[in-house]
């Protein structure tokens, strides 16, 4: 999966199309990412007591994961780009590059 935690992405399809956000969690086994402020859902939680005796519960709004195919990585110029790889000459490791301008991500 070419999108990692901490990347800034643009949502390219779905109900939040056009939204930008930071990747909070990447789930490579499920091909999903959790993006800040995108795909907000209302979760109904049961009431439970905390150690101070305050009741917590009700309807909580939180982000839900979306498919990685619905997001595009933003390059250093803030434009959506596809991701490529190249070998680093010094370390020999793969480095992600932006296909739009060829710069490292």
Swiss-Prot record:
Role description: One of two assembly initiator proteins, it binds directly to the 5'-end of the 23S rRNA, where it nucleates assembly of the 50S subunit. One of the proteins that surrounds the polypeptide exit tunnel on the outside of the subunit.
Family designation: Belongs to the universal ribosomal protein uL24 family.
A GO molecular function held by the record: structural constituent of ribosome
CDD domains (UniProt xref): KOW_RPL26
The protein's name: Large ribosomal subunit protein uL24
Record keywords: Ribonucleoprotein, Ribosomal protein, RNA-binding, rRNA-binding
Comp. bias (Basic and acidic residues): 77-93
Region ranges (Disordered): 77-105
GO cellular component: ribonucleoprotein complex; ribosome
Top-level taxonomic group: Bacteria
